[in-house]
Amino acid sequence: GLRTVSSLPTETLDIPRLCLTGRAPPRGAKVELSHIDVSHNMEHWPSFHNGVSAGLRLSTRPESTDIDSTWITFNKPKSNDNNPNAVTEHAGFLMALGLNGHLTKLGRLESFDYLIKGSEAISIGLLLGMSASKRGSMDTLVTKKLATQLEALLPHTATELPLSHNTQVAALMGVGLLDSGTGHQRMVELCLKELGKPPGPELENCVDRE
């Protein structure tokens, strides 16, 4: 259930595997996804949200949690993990930590390491999680991290970086959370300008709408 699980410093949080097997009437024959033509990334977002739901089980009571920067990084998927969606689930786990306020305990170097070496999903989960943890605070450090993934926050003289559309959207949402209720004129104008941009002539920015 929500916020019912206490963390242990020597154990990682268990993320249950998604059940993607169904039953077909009338005899209840088992249906596996391996027998059906599906998109190669069909499990991507379900796995992300599975990580979020698992992370939201962690308690927020100080006396029942041992969450710190070491424990958060201890939960990183291991290289020998046989779950192909482990990294995506960990990304959702990071977002859940942020929603419950735990991501404020992640060290500065560890957070930058996630952004530099992590996948697109990791960047999305981390940016949204950090912004949710610091909602309405206009935190300078989090703003700098968002700026590394959002061209609109970078100075005109900055080197052009190969940023994915999804991480830029996450960073923009992060700006909205971080500056929520502050009435910061520059950030309001920036968000409105970004939201008003057309998708482009080839609609390359209209994929993966979730």
Language-model segments: residues:
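Alpha-solenoid helical-repeat scaffolds
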Residues: 1-210
